[in-house]
């Protein structure tokens, strides 16, 4: 009888000890996100849809080693940053960032903003940029996660200057796009009061 009681107590201790590990392993926020995106150049007039799995836990593990889950959600972010097919026409630029907004909201992000180039005709050195932020928790601490989506399709011939090289030094056209993205991120952080 004594052995049974000890065995039951050991089983109970083992089961109870697994509860914190199970709770820590799953943040409980895993969700399927429907991402709409523009595909093709003039071949169609609608956005496509793909699903991705999002969880804040994607950002509590190291990004220094390849992780399929993070790669897939990163692709979803890149897709969402494309301008919606609805914005192809000059009278409909206001919908340019709607796919990014939808994805960010589904993932629980707030402070969703886009630069002016998401809403007006492109220029040779313009680049559309979207940002959103949210607070995530890891190891008992709170951190601000900022999603930055740079438009990579259905961009109305923007960033054409990317092919411009300089006689010496860095790739001038690429540097112009890089600087716009970093400047917009800095202004987003300041505007939203993120520290």
List where the protein language model places each region.
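Charged, compositionally biased non-catalytic regions
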Residues: 32-109
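Positively charged n-region of N-terminal signal peptides that target proteins for export
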Residues: 1-5, 9
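A conserved cap/lid and substrate-binding interface adjacent to the catalytic center
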Residues: 99-194
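Short stretches within intrinsically disordered, low-complexity N-terminal or propeptide regions
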Residues: 23-24, 80, 106, 134
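Hydrophobic core
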Residues: 10-18
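Sec-dependent signal peptide cleavage junction
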Residues: 18-29
């Amino acid at each position: 009888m004594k052995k049974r009681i000890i065995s039951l107590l050991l089983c109970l201790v083992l089961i109870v000890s697994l509860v914190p590990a199970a709770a820590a392993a799953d943040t409980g926020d895993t969700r399927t996100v429907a991402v709409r995106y523009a595909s093709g150049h003039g071949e169609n007039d609608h956005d496509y849809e793909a699903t991705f799995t999002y969880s804040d836990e994607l950002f509590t593990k190291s990004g220094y080693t390849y992780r399929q889950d993070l790669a897939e959600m990163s692709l979803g972010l890149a897709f969402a940053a494309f301008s919606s097919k609805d914005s192809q026409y000059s009278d409909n630029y206001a919908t340019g960032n709607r796919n990014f907004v939808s994805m960010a909201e589904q993932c629980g992000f707030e402070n969703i903003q886009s630069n002016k180039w998401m809403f007006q005709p492109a220029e040779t050195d313009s680049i559309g940029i979207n940002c959103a932020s949210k607070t995530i928790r890891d190891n008992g601490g709170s951190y601000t996660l900022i999603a930055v989506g740079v438009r990579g399709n259905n961009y109305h011939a923007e960033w054409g200057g990317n092919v411009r090289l300089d006689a010496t030094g860095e790739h001038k056209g690429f540097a112009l796009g890089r600087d716009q993205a970093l400047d917009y991120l800095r202004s987003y952080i300041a505007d939203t009061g993120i520290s």
